[in-house]
């Protein structure tokens, strides 16, 4: 077994590189504790969901470098990266994570703005006369 498990998670325009080692349960994101980086509890819980579901919150030290996008996309990227790292470590966790759809990259991206319109779908006001 490898000492350090290195995986990548992506969501929207965010990319998270996850480095997982056996340890005491410390999670560091961009050199900050997870509580400081994701101050919003919902985003923090979303990022750490794979650890909670597999009941391995105290078994690993996780170091994450994440860049791009906003906090919502970053928490999704971190979640996918952690889920992929857990499956590399323990194949039994794969079934639980797959059932919760945590191993699937979310394909939803921002729709591009079209010319002749205000935004992707919103048009300028239409006047019949």
UniProtKB/Swiss-Prot annotation:
* Record flagged with keyword Nucleotidyltransferase: no
Q: In its keyword annotation, does this UniProt entry include Nucleus?
A: no
One GO cellular component assignment for this chain's record is:
cytoplasm
Question: Pfam families in the record, alphabetically?
Answer: Ribosomal_S9
- Which branch of life, at top level? Bacteria
Question: May I ask which residue range the UniProt record assigns to the signal sequence?
Answer: none
Provide the GO biological process annotations.
translation
In the record, the note on similarity to other proteins reads:
Belongs to the universal ribosomal protein uS9 family.
PROSITE patterns in the record:
RIBOSOMAL_S9
Cross-referenced InterPro entries: Ribosomal_Su5_D2-typ_SF (IPR020568), Ribosomal_uS9 (IPR000754), Ribosomal_uS9_bac/plastid (IPR023035), Ribosomal_uS9_CS (IPR020574), Ribsml_uS5_D2-typ_fold_subgr (IPR014721)
- Protein name per Swiss-Prot or TrEMBL: Small ribosomal subunit protein uS9
Supply the source organism's classification.
Answer: Bacteria, Pseudomonadati, Chlorobiota, Chlorobiia, Chlorobiales
* UniProt-recorded Gene Ontology molecular function terms: RNA binding; structural constituent of ribosome
Q: Which UniProt keywords apply?
A: Ribonucleoprotein, Ribosomal protein
